[in-house]
Amino acid sequence: MRLGSRAAMAPPLGNDLHTVRTEHRHTRRSLLAGLAAFGAAGALGATGCTRVASSGKNGGDLLDRLRAQGVVRLGIAGEIPFGYIDRDGNLTGEAPELARVIFKRLGVDRVQPVPTEFGSLIPGLNAQQFDVVAAGMYVTPDRCEQVIFADPDYRMPDAFVVRKGNPLGLHTYADALRRHAKIATGTGYAQIQHAVEAGFKESDLVIVPDQVAGLNAVESGRVDLFTGTAVTVRLVARGSAKAESTKPFVALVDGKPKADGGAFAFRPTETRLRDAFNAELHKLRRSGELYRIVRPFGFTRAEMTTLTAKELCGS
């Protein structure tokens, strides 16, 4: 999952690498090219009146407007497994599927994707290009100054893609540093910070566009490992004849274990919508339905969490 300014219900991925790569091409390139018109048309069409600014009085009135319109626009960034368009042109992913269930309970029948680059999600949200960020976005103190978050729906450790058999014995960043391993990770990924905290120089990291490029780098021997979120790594390494994923581990940041939590983001004026969303999220968490919704996207019970946005925002 991405950290910086650029920072993821049939099963979303097949059981082989070809499917992962095919899905990825649809979510990175054709998502923006093929659906830009769709997203723009939707934003200017039936949902256009959601562009009316809310004063934030009494927590904002966006929830009422969404109920009246029957549709909510979701900002997505085309990242498997968090929020993307599948091979058939359908919106799916951990966050959109969860959004469908929660907004249905809130009286909003439909969700509509608005594809954008990851770094444009928060600016686009605050510019009212869409109503909520549904991209599995990590909750960080910096982001908490720009948007308000629901409580996290998952907590994610790191993992590596390594060559089959893990010949260098790479299980943590400390292992990688000791073995002088060459590391690749994705553009804007939180794992850049995690590797730097472990002692790597950022200039020594190989930055690739995405997890598929990272897998290719490991398979070709250009790097010793690719690091990403545990779920991303599991999915991209599945079916590879030359690479495998390691067990998840929690990185150390400022000397303390840190597993990031991903959540939905809302405009700061829309506390009423955020609170209503949170109430339904907590019900799903307690009933176990939350896990059943996200499990098809590669999530495990170990990645479910009771963390709050307040904890992650640092206030």
Language-model features, listed with the residues they occupy:
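Flexible hinge/capping segments at coil-to-helix
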Residues: 65, 163-182
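Extended ligand-binding regions for polar small-molecule ligands
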Residues: 50, 96-105, 166, 174, ...
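A ligand-binding cleft/hinge motif common to bilobed small-molecule-binding domains
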Residues: 136-145, 196-197, 224-258
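Ligand-binding cleft/hinge of the Venus flytrap
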Residues: 85-86, 99-109, 189-209, 237-242
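N-terminal secretory signal peptides
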Residues: 1-26, 37-44
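Short loop->beta-strand "edge-of-pocket" segments that line small-molecule binding or catalytic clefts
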Residues: 71-78, 82, 173-191, 224
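Extracytoplasmic small-molecule ligand-binding "clamshell" domains
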Residues: 57-135, 145
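Periplasmic-binding protein-like
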Residues: 155-161, 240-279, 300-315
